[in-house]
Every structure is written in C-alpha cells, then in structure tokens.
Curated annotation (Swiss-Prot):
UniProt keyword annotations, A-Z: Cell membrane, Cell projection, Endoplasmic reticulum, Golgi apparatus, Hydrolase, Membrane, Notch signaling pathway, Protease, Synapse, Transmembrane, Transmembrane helix
Protease in keyword set: yes
Organism taxonomic ancestry: Eukaryota, Metazoa, Chordata, Craniata, Vertebrata
Motif (PAL): 422-424
PANTHER family the record matches: PRESENILIN, PRESENILIN-1
Broad class of the protein's primary localization: endoplasmic reticulum
Region of interest called Disordered, as start-end residue ranges on this chain: 9-56, 332-365
Record remark: domains: The PAL motif is required for normal active site conformation. Substrates, such as NOTCH1 and APP peptides, are bound between PSEN1 transmembrane domains and via the first lumenal loop and the cytoplasmic loop between the sixth and seventh transmembrane domains. Substrate binding causes a conformation change and formation of an intermolecular antiparallel beta-sheet between PSEN1 and its substrates.
Record-stated family: Belongs to the peptidase A22A family.
Gene expressing this chain: psen1
Full protein name: Presenilin-1
Molecular function per GO: aspartic endopeptidase activity, intramembrane cleaving
Length: 456
C-alpha cells in the first residue's frame, strides 16, 4: 500500500528555510580568508529584517509548487487510467470471465442466492486485505532493520514478473485482437528489450521520462490483472476496504506506512523507486553517494571553525587585524591603490568568489511522490467501471473526474498539513459514489430520455 509523500529532505529543508527566513539575526564577521578575497576591511552586515514581501514570496512559492504538483500528478494518473480503459474497451481478454481467480480469493461468486454471494465476496475481501496488511508489515520490518538487499530482491523479482511475463500476455492479446501476425523470435526479442530496459531504468539508472513511463505501465498491467481475475463484488469491496486501511496505515501513530515514512525521514533516505512514482529522478545507487558526499562536505566546517578560533588571539595581539604593510603592498600591486571609489567597489564585486555554489538539489527535493498502489487502484476503479457499466461512457468519465477531484483535495490537504497523507480515501470514496450514482440513477434516466426522444 502506498501513500502520498513528499521527500523527507524536502520537509526538513523547508522547515529550516522557514525558520531562518522569519528570524532576525546578525551575521558573524567574516574570516581572514574572506577578507583577503574581498580586498576590503571587514564590515558587519546590517541585521536581517522580515518584510511583508518575503511572506508574499512564501505564499507565491507555495501556490506555484502546489499547482505544479497537481499537474505533475494529473498527467501520469490520467495516462495510467487511459491505458487501462483503452485496453478494456479494445481487448476482450480482460473482460471475459473464464472461471479463473486469484489464489487470494478462493470463494466463488456464482452462487444461488444473493446472500451467499455477498458473504463470499466479503470473505474474499477480508483475505485480500489481510494479505496486503501482512506484506506491508513484512516490508516495514525489513526496512526498519535495514534489510535493503532483501527488499531490492523482492521488488526486483516482482518487476521482473510484470515486465516479462505479464507484458508477454498483454502484447500477445493485443496482437490477437488486432490480427497482427508475429513470429516467436521477434516477440521474444521485443519482450527482452522491453523488460531489460525497464529493469535498468527502475532499479539502476535511466532517463526520468522513461522511468516514469515504465512505472505507469507496470501499474496499468497490475490493474488489468486485478480487473480480470477479481470477482465483481469482491473488487468493489476491496476498493472500499483498501481506502479505509490506507487511512489507518498512514494517519495512525503506529500505522505501518507512517512508520515507514518516519523511518525514511529519520534516516534521510528516499523510499525505493520501485514503490513510488516520483516527479523527479530517484536512483538507488545515488543514495549512498549523496549521503557520503554530505558527510564529507560536513567535516571541513568544524575544522575551519577551529582554525578561526585558534587564530583569533594572535590577531587581537597584533592589533592590526592582519592588515600588515606587506599585505597592503601586495593588494595595491594586484588591485591598484585602494581607494573607496565607485570603480574599485565595482571591480571588487565582480571578482569571482571562492565560496562553493549552493546545492542544486532543491528542485529535485521538491518533487512530489505518489505510491504505485494508488495508480493501481485508481486504474482498477475506472477499468472496472468501464467493464461492468454496460459499456456506458458516462459512468467511466464520472469515475475518472471523481478520482481527479479527490486527488486535488488530497494535494490541498497536503499543502495545509505538510505531512504524508493517504491518497486513496478521498479519491476512491468519490469514485465509488460517482459510479453507483451514475450507473443506477443517471444512466437509466438518460436511457429513458433517449427512448422517448425527450431532450433537455
């Protein structure tokens, strides 16, 4: 089960930026190295003053990235649902019921009475949700005890199965539907290239757009498997139950998904890219490198402070602040006579600075992330509506709009509370309400209008 998270480093960085932005402070005097770079005696900068323009910039930044995040999520969610609906409408394989069911749903719904069917569907939903809960707990325990290799092997095998086996079934049914002749050698070559490139992009390194495309395709394939092999009533009950479980797992203090997110925040680590759709690149092999770089870059700072503290008594004893005649002659030889003129100040300001540039990870840290499970169940709801609503496009479009509205509200709450929130409850609730209302009220009403040739 997946949740809507922003990166932990983004939260820590934003909190630190907000705290420093709204706190008045006086900068410390520059060190001797900075004095020699500037070529001027040190001057204390004026204290920072909080103005209304800075608060306006904060609000503008929030609105900018909030709207940007909405667009970043609308496009992949829409593409995933479009792939599923297009497959349902064109490939009859995923709508035909051949009696096969998942091993997690052993009870059949082709019973004599409605009561037995409802009971069997509830039992199937309970078993399915129990399996999801157990798998989530196993994942959290493995992550808690840093069993990263086991998690990577687990995700590697799952993606291997999806990209090769389920993709082979999907491609074969598409070719059969459109009557495309294909030999086994060419088909094997296509599947091999598709699967290998996908495994490289997801578990190692690749272009961002290609990684996102593979994650969307994996979610669509999984949603199609659920649509075909889950009984109808069981599927609707699972959608309702999974939204409740997602709410509890993320918001409860001891919820498994909340523990997973908080653990990642404490360790300043990114969640595995095979579990999360990210609007920015997440590479597994870069995680250790980034942490090592941060650790290495943090060591010289206290060392430099120690040097400054050790040199301070000597500078005070000489009573010249380090501006010896030899130093003045050297600076005059390089810069000319030091006169406080407009030309000299402009030349000094144009001199290159030896300070390292600020890290360029700010835009990447702002990337919004959505669990692949959310993609799967969104697409499952829309695909199930398209498959069981007697081919009615009104019901399908109603579910599609309901999911996007729920996603907007979830992102709005995310901007307000600024913490990890579940992405399923609002969208799935809206989708279920819109589905049953449209299928049982709107569609019969419109059919009667069409029969009597009555136009509104």
């Amino acid at each position: 089960m997946a949740d809507l998270v922003q990166n932990a480093a983004n939260n820590v960085l934003n909190d630190g930026m907000d705290t420093s932005r709204h706190t008045s402070s006086t900068a410390a005097p520059p060190s001797r190295n900075e004095v020699e770079l500037n070529g001027q005696p040190p001057t204390a900068p004026p204290p920072q003053v909080v103005t209304d323009s800075e608060e306006d910039e904060d609000e503008e930044l929030t609105l900018k990235y909030g709207a940007k995040h909405v667009i970043m999520l609308f496009i992949p969610v829409t593409l995933c649902m479009v792939v599923v609906v297009a497959t349902i409408k064109s490939v009859s394989f995923y709508t035909q019921k051949d009696g096969q069911q998942l091993i997690y749903t052993p009870f059949r719904e082709d019973t004599e009475t409605v009561g037995q069917r409802a009971l069997h569907s509830m039992l199937n939903a309970i078993i399915m949700i129990s399996v999801i809960v157990v798998m989530t707990l196993v994942l959290v325990v493995l992550y808690k005890y840093r069993c990263y290799k086991v998690i990577q092997a687990w995700l590697f095998f799952s993606n291997l199965l999806l990209l090769f086996f389920f993709s082979l079934i999907y491609l074969g049914e598409v070719f059969k539907t459109y009557n495309v002749a294909m030999d086994y050698f060419t088909l094997a070559l296509i599947i091999w290239n598709f699967g290998v490139v996908g495994m490289i992009c997801i578990h190692w390194k690749g272009p961002l757009r290609l990684q996102q495309a593979y994650l969307i395709m994996i979610s669509a394939l999984m949603a199609l498997v659920f649509i075909k092999y889950l009984p109808e009533w069981t599927a609707w009950l699972i959608l309702a139950a999974i939204s409740v479980y997602d709410l509890l797992a993320v918001l409860c203090p001891k919820g498994p998904l909340r523990i997973l997110v908080e653990t990642a925040q404490e360790r300043n680590e990114a969640i595995f890219p095979a579990l999360i759709y990210s609007s920015t690149m997440v590479w597994l092999f870069n995680m250790a490198d980034s942490a090592e770089t941060r650790n290495n870059s943090s060591h010289p700072v206290p060392q430099q402070e120690n040097q400054v503290v050790a040199m301070a008594p000597t500078a005070q004893a000489e009573d010249d602040g380090g501006f010896t005649p030899a130093w003045v002659d050297h600076q005059q030889h390089q810069l000319g006579p030091m006169q406080s003129t407009e030309e000299s100040r402009r030349q000094i300001q144009e001199m290159p600075s030896a300070r390292p540039p600020p890290p360029a990870d700010d835009d990447e840290e702002r990337g919004v992330k959505l669990g692949l499970g959310d993609f799967i169940f969104y697409s499952m709801l829309v695909g199930k509506a398209s498959a069981t609503a007697s081919g009615d496009w009104n019901t399908t479009l109603a579910c599609f709009v309901a999911i996007l509205i729920g996603l907007c509200l979830t992102l709005l709450l995310l901007a307000i509370f600024k913490k990890a929130l579940p992405a399923l409850p609002i969208s799935i609730t809206f989708g279920l309400v819109f589905y049953f209302a449209t299928d049982n009220l709107v569609r019969p009403f419109m059919d009667q209008l069409a029969v009597h040739q009555f136009y509104i």
